[in-house]
Amino acid sequence: VRVYTESPPKLKKTAEHTIDLVIGVFDEASSFERAAIEKALHWGDGELKLRTETGSEQLFSTTSACPKCGFSVPELDPRWFSFNTKQGRCETCEGHGVLHEEEREGRGKNAQVYVVESECTECHGARLAPIPRAVRVSGERYHELTGRSVTSALSRVKSWKFSGDTALVARPVVIELVRRLEFLDEVGLGYLALDRAASTLSGGEMQRLRLAAQLGAGLTGALYVLDEPTIGLHPRDTGRLLGNLRRLVDLGSTVLVVEHDIDTIRAADHLVDLGPSGGANGGHVVAQGSPRQVLTNVASPTGRALARAPEQRAALPVPRGHAMLELTGASEHNLKNVDISVPLGRFIVVAGVSGSGKSTLVRQVLLPAVRQKLKLVTDEPGAFSTLRGTEPVMRALSVDQSPIGRTPRSVPATFLGIWDLIRRVFAASPEAKVLGFDASRFSFNTPKGGRCTTCDGQGSLTHEMSFLPDVVTACPACGGQRFEPQTLGVRYKGLSAGDVLALTAEQAVSVFENHPKIVAPLRTLCDLGAGYITLGQGSHTLSGGEAQRLKLAAELTAGARHEHTLYVLDEPTTGLHVADVEKLVHVLGRLVDRGDTLVVIEHHPQVMAGADWLIELGPEGGDAGGRIVAQGPPRDVAKKKTATGVVLSAEMSL
């Protein structure tokens, strides 16, 4: 758009603009005036553009030009090295590094559309435009450096050597870059690639990333709140994390941490213990003071749990010749041609420092490979050579932390399969028989039942707010009890169907003590430390750990099953109090006791000590990981000087 300088247009401050000054218009190249060229170079700081009638542009520079071909490069600034800016990003993939194409399978109504992701054919995943891709510092390009792990990049940057004027410019930048990379390494993120998408980071990794940023900011007088920052962190690295939290305190800030990790609890200046239990039985400060004061307080559940040695599960032996699931040549991501042996019918823990390849080995290679062998629906497994010994296995599944439902209609009682049984209990009551109610009357998910017609059995109403989050309020007709008045009039032990949905799992165990099929999954849920969950709590409000424990309870009480199942769990201790970890280990042991195989990714010392077989990956994270450093019974691993071996030795008092 050409405008006159006498009446320039108003430009948005937040938008990016390219502004060129027109020096002259010429009919043909031979008519170029020397004075116009000199004027353009003067106003353009040594650069000028030539635009043809077709709209194509060519840049000419007196400072950044190739003497052989004449190709000119504009003056570079940091924006050129960002794939989020117009000049820096690759035009083909718009800075994503990948191309997305739709593929159709089938025809008509049965057609399914898949989005296929492939590497960008122009930048080959670098995400940058040709000019920034060509710039090198000490022989390395920008996208090559950001493709390294934090530890590798730190080592590379420290090796840079500059001289003369370049050293004067580079020195302060390199010092700050090294400082920030060291902060990332110190909080246990040395294995992360610098260009890794933030959306793929775990909650613990994201917290530690923010912590590293705060360490670099050097603020004083701030209040920092962290929720379980040790999630995903190997015990070996907890000390470094605590050291960095202490640095924030030394700077004059206050650090408030919600945490179950024993080392973090003992390192605190002031400890607040809430309880005495969870849910309705919690919410009270039962003890506070120094860790020593709280841990010697008999009223403190945390103090009681730490005052005694945990009761370790009796490990099952793995004799020579025991049936094994053998995976060889796993080489996905950072795995280095890994071979593992998984004893069937045993409790196996896969441990290792953060980024050593645990999740890649178990969730991206082993589980999909087994499911593929069993002809079950699965993602394509990661690279491996062979898989043997799957014959006894009939099922393979991951008991993960994904949501079990996304609406108020899905509740723990329906997920565990006990609401149908409870409906029959109500239908068998004298009041229900007099009124002619059958079990369907007590369903809040069917229109023909006795559900509240105002909220359709959801117990709440959602109000859409323009430009604001939706507001959820209790239904004014049923008061959140999901049923209409006549249905609520039917009672069992003085409780209506709505009252039963408001019970916690612990309370429901005593109410339905004469109904074993109802009590069994609820008791298992209590054993898993989730007895505070109410039967009618919306599944979409459950945390990942709570959803995982509900899935475990459902699997353990699914009835008689003669199918050997391979279960995979990823850090099931997340969010668990130290007193509940012991319960978890014994409940997991029940799966093994009935003949199933359990593979758990975990580095909680108590869980590792309670396993039958331990596989340790390492020795470090990222490129320095991906190898088997120890494999065998926990007592054997504890004798090795590996990261996990040292922790296990202390836990098992060897």
Residue spans of the language-model regions?
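Conserved phosphate-binding elements of NTP-dependent enzyme cores
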Residues: 1-654
